[in-house]
Amino acid sequence: MTKLAQWLWGLAILGSTWVALTTGALGLELPLSCQEVLWPLPAYLLVSAGCYALGTVGYRVATFHDCEDAARELQSQIQEARADLARRGLRF
């Protein structure tokens, strides 16, 4: 099962649970305070997921390490490839 399928299954389960609780399809009588919290819950979860994603991206950018050795190695491989292609008659 792919990661997308796992997320879609999770969203389907959460969404169907939310719909069942908000519409009263299960026959449960929730107190008014629970209903007031339950209605905007998807919006709260969406905002929370967005904040988490933004924080994760910000943290990863802030702690990103430069790989100077790998960059030098890649540049040398590019030069070798250009020299090889020039030997074979390709012009850039």
From Swiss-Prot:
Quaternary organization: Component of the dolichol-phosphate mannose (DPM) synthase complex composed of DPM1, DPM2 and DPM3; within the complex, associates with DPM1 via its C-terminal domain and with DPM2 via its N-terminal portion. This interaction stabilizes DPM1 protein.
Q: Where does it live in the cell?
A: Endoplasmic reticulum membrane
Keyword Hydrolase found: no
Query: What job does this protein perform?
Result: Stabilizer subunit of the dolichol-phosphate mannose (DPM) synthase complex; tethers catalytic subunit DPM1 to the endoplasmic reticulum.
Family (UniProt)? Belongs to the DPM3 family.
**Membrane spanning segments where?**
8-28, 37-57
Q: What is this protein called?
A: Dolichol-phosphate mannosyltransferase subunit 3
Q: Which organism is it from?
A: Homo sapiens
Per the record, the pathway is:
Protein modification; protein glycosylation
Which keywords appear in this protein's UniProt record, sorted alphabetically?
Answer: Congenital disorder of glycosylation, Congenital muscular dystrophy, Disease variant, Dystroglycanopathy, Endoplasmic reticulum, Membrane, Transmembrane, Transmembrane helix
Tell me a GO cellular component. dolichol-phosphate-mannose synthase complex
Q: Linked disorder? A: Muscular dystrophy-dystroglycanopathy congenital with impaired intellectual development B15: An autosomal recessive, congenital muscular disorder characterized by hyperCKemia, myopathic features observed on muscle biopsy, developmental delay, mildly impaired intellectual development with learning difficulties, epilepsy, and mild white matter abnormalities.
Any one Gene Ontology molecular-function term assigned to this protein's record: enzyme activator activity
